[in-house]
Swiss-Prot record:
Gene3D superfamilies: Vaccinia Virus protein VP39. Its EC number is 2.1.1.205. It catalyses: cytidine(32)/guanosine(34) in tRNA + 2 S-adenosyl-L-methionine = 2'-O-methylcytidine(32)/2'-O-methylguanosine(34) in tRNA + 2 S-adenosyl-L-homocysteine + 2 H(+). GO terms for cellular component: cytoplasm; cytosol; nucleus. It comes from Schizosaccharomyces pombe (strain 972 / ATCC 24843). This is tRNA (cytidine(32)/guanosine(34)-2'-O)-methyltransferase. S-adenosyl-L-methionine binds at G53, W55, D83, D99, D124. The lineage of its organism: Eukaryota, Fungi, Dikarya, Ascomycota, Taphrinomycotina. It is found in: Cytoplasm.
Length: 285
């Protein structure tokens, strides 16, 4: 599919480029915030699996848009974005190229907050899907649990955690694990997420770890007496019903039909970069 046809087919894809977002996923976080007020009172925020940076862009624009420039630097909202892949810089965001499963990552993140806990942790991480749904769901669950394990080590009591999930037949077990640490767990589907996709987001509110919980990245989720561990999370649709439908096709204005918009930020180190270079040099057919 060429860029022009995708511009015409996917309203959010084109809208993201028009508004300067690095990816259409920016609208998912915006719609989640409309529903849950995620950014209210957030001063220290962590974006895990952040590349290419659209969620970090949203955090920067929303948290810093009305900030008085005269206030002290340590009183301004602080945003730390973490990913294994390098990221192009974003205003107001500290980008770290780190592994979220490595024990040292925790101390590095906290050092940027002056060793103070975070108010909000978000994660839009997902694997490269294989088409084998059971395998994709399993890998996605492992990414989520890695993000969750780091989140419970950096969050303050009452903090919030948002992460992508693939809803499968065993998703209620995942909700139960999350519910052990948060008083409220919801499953949300932004309008900008295609209805044909099994993608949704868990929104965990009011972080409330057990009294005997000791944060430790080397012992993931080694807590607790799992009493009342069965949990059915409410499913919430987010986004204005008058907005664009992610599964619909919309016409493009006549004067725009031949116009394509460049991406806001090309990938900094894509795995296919060397293959493209070889193809351009005619060394690979």
């Amino acid at each position: 599919m060429g860029r022009s046809s995708k511009d015409k087919r996917d309203a959010y894809y084109r809208l993201a480029k028009e508004q300067g977002w690095r990816a259409r996923s920016a609208f998912k976080l915006l719609q989640l915030n409309e529903q849950f007020n995620l950014f209210e009172g957030a001063k220290r925020v962590v974006d895990l699996c952040a590349a290419p940076g659209s969620w970090s862009q949203v955090l920067s624009r929303e948290l810093l848009k009305n900030i008085d420039t005269s206030i002290a630097a340590d009183e301004k909202p602080m945003i730390v974005a973490v990913d294994l892949q390098p990221m192009a810089p974003i205003d107001g965001v500290c980008t770290l190229q780190l592994d979220i499963t490595h024990p040292n990552t925790l101390s590095i993140i906290l050092s940027h907050f002056g060793n103070e806990p975070a108010d909000l942790v978000v994660s839009d991480g997902a694997p490269d899907v294989t088409g084998l749904h059971d395998l994709d769901e399993y890998i996605q669950a492992q990414i989520l649990l890695a993000a969750f394990n780091l989140a419970v080590c950096v969050l303050k009591p009452g903090g919030k955690f948002v992460a992508k999930i693939f809803r499968g037949r065993d998703v209620s077990l995942l909700y139960s694990q999350l519910r052990l640490m948060f008083r409220k767990v919801s499953c949300a589907k932004p309008r900008s997420s295609r209805a044909s996709s099994i993608e949704s987001f868990v929104v965990c509110e009011d972080f409330n770890p057990p009294s005997n919980f000791q944060p430790d990245l080397t012992k993931p989720l080694c807590v607790i007496d799992p009493t009342n561990a069965h949990e059915i999370a409410p499913f919430i649709a987010c986004g204005d019903l008058d907005g664009y439908d992610a599964d619909a096709t919309y016409p493009v204005e006549i004067n725009m039909k031949k116009a394509t918009l460049d991406v806001i930020q090309p990938p900094t180190a894509p795995p296919y970069k060397r293959a493209i270079e070889l193809k351009h040099s005619k060394m690979m057919s």
